[in-house]
């Protein structure tokens, strides 16, 4: 068998973490919250079938053709209009899922050795996506009592390390399941804005 030469950066990637989580979720009697897999009973199968049939009946050729790399223009317009703040459709990028979005963020914001800040604990799929670009990761831990981030830790670390961005999950955080209260989100946004720290 041919011994293929892979890029050096792949040596830092841990492809087994997500694979092992998803493998465990297929075992009988296991209800796994780790992989973020929704219950199959919750899928709106009938609604998807109806939408698919309508599109294939009314716009079959457009539906099967490639779209722009930014995503389907009418959908980007709809997303822009649906957001609670003013945004142009030109600033909306559609991806095939969160993993593609995380990979693109890593691709455009991380150089080898650049620093990123992450909420701890954090979503292993994001850490895996970012690791391909070989950043130096530092943690902003949740307070064990309140479950909230310590903004003073974020400020101190940003002033010391100058991270490219701060990654966290504000809704249904994986793995904790916690959602940040609205008033804390406002404090976090103000803190990051003052630090010039983009939030992912």
Over which residues does each language-model region extend?
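Conserved core of the PLP fold type I
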Residues: 62-196
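N-terminal small-domain helix-loop-helix segment of the aminotransferase-like
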Residues: 11-97, 104
């Amino acid at each position: 068998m041919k011994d293929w030469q892979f890029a050096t950066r792949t040596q830092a990637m841990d492809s087994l973490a997500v694979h092992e989580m998803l493998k465990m979720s297929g075992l009988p009697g296991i209800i796994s919250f780790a992989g973020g897999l929704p219950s199959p009973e919750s899928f709106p199968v009938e609604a998807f079938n109806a939408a698919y049939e309508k599109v294939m009946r009314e716009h079959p050729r457009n539906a099967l053709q490639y779209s722009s790399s930014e995503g389907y223009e009418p959908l980007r317009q709809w997303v822009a209009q649906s957001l609670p703040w003013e945004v142009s459709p030109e600033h909306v990028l559609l991806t095939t899922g969160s993993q593609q979005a995380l990979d693109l963020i890593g691709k455009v914001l991380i150089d080898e050795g650049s620093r990123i800040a992450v909420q701890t604990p954090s979503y292993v799929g994001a850490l895996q996506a970012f690791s391909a670009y070989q950043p130096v990761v530092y943690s902003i831990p949740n307070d064990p009592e309140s479950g909230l981030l310590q903004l003073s830790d974020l400020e101190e670390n940003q002033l010391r390390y100058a991270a490219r961005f701060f990654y966290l999950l504000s809704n249904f955080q994986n793995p904790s399941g916690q959602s940040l209260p609205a008033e804390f989100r406002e404090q976090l946004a103000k803190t990051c804005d003052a630090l010039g720290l983009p939030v992912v």
